[in-house]
Regions:
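N-terminal cofactor/phosphate-binding cores enriched in small/glycine residues
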Residues: 1
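Iron-sulfur cluster-binding cysteine motifs and their immediate structural context
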Residues: 7, 12-39, 207
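Iron-sulfur cluster-binding electron-transfer modules in prokaryotic oxidoreductases
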Residues: 29-228
Length: 228
């Protein structure tokens, strides 16, 4: 089982991956930390409050509508912050006080290119990002369509899986990955094909690039994940 000392150090890792860019031996610390997080989740018993917070994050943050609702509740909760425990006050302080953006509608979305279509790209709208910073996706769509790119959000795509992956909840993360691989493969193999996948959140991009490794043992989707 993981010790408290190990858990403390792994929990403090931000997965910035600076260690990988500076390591002269090329050690893949990303996969080592990912393995450690899963091992901790499966073998270490966290305090009750910590377990419930992590379960709440896994159940809410990957789903934009749930996350938006939680942010509204947090904004209301700030009114009662003075009488709440310190840890809850600290968490509420992180929540935005301004109105949150409404997530994109579910299902397939297509923004046609302005003029002659030159390229066709998939857009990963993200989960947390499209609630807290939807203008980034809006600007991306405007720019790409103006440059002659058709932009598509695939039906069935969603969270990249990074949130649950970093919580050590491997099964939930891999399910999110499978959902995206299936959704994107349908567009990639379609009549019009796909020229690129556009990801605005760097953490999501890092995870998507690792889909081949994450699903390396999946008999049905390993090849499709590696292609992505």
């Amino acid at each position: 089982p993981a010790s408290e000392k190990v858990v403390k150090h792994v929990d403090r890792c931000l997965s910035c991956l600076s260690c990988m860019t500076t390591c002269p031996s090329g050690v893949n610390y990303m996969h080592l930390v990912d393995h450690a997080r899963t091992h901790i989740e499966n073998t270490y018993t966290r305090p009750f409050f910590d377990r419930k917070v992590r379960d709440l994050l896994a159940a809410v943050m990957p789903y934009p509508r749930r996350f938006r609702a939680l942010m509204w509740l947090a904004a209301i909760g700030k009114l009662f912050a003075p009488v709440l425990p310190q840890r809850l006050r600290a968490m509420l302080a992180l929540a935005p006080s301004t109105p949150m953006s409404r997530p994109l509608d579910a299902g397939r979305i297509v923004w046609p290119a302005a003029g002659t279509r030159k390229k066709r790209v998939l857009l990963m709208p993200g989960c947390v990002q499209q609630v807290l910073a939807a203008r980034i996706n809006d600007a991306t769509v405007r720019l790409l369509t103006r440059l002659g790119h058709e932009v598509v959000v695939a039906d069935g795509s969603g969270c990249c899986g990074a949130l649950t992956h970093h919580l050590g909840k491997e099964d939930l993360a891999h399910q999110a990955v499978r959902n995206n691989v299936r959704a994107w493969t349908g567009e990639i193999d379609g009549a019009d094909g796909i020229d690129a996948i556009v990801v605005n959140a760097s953490g999501c991009g890092t995870t998507v690039k690792d889909y081949g490794f994450m699903l390396r043992g999946d008999a049905d989707l390993a090849d499709a994940a590696a292609k992505i």
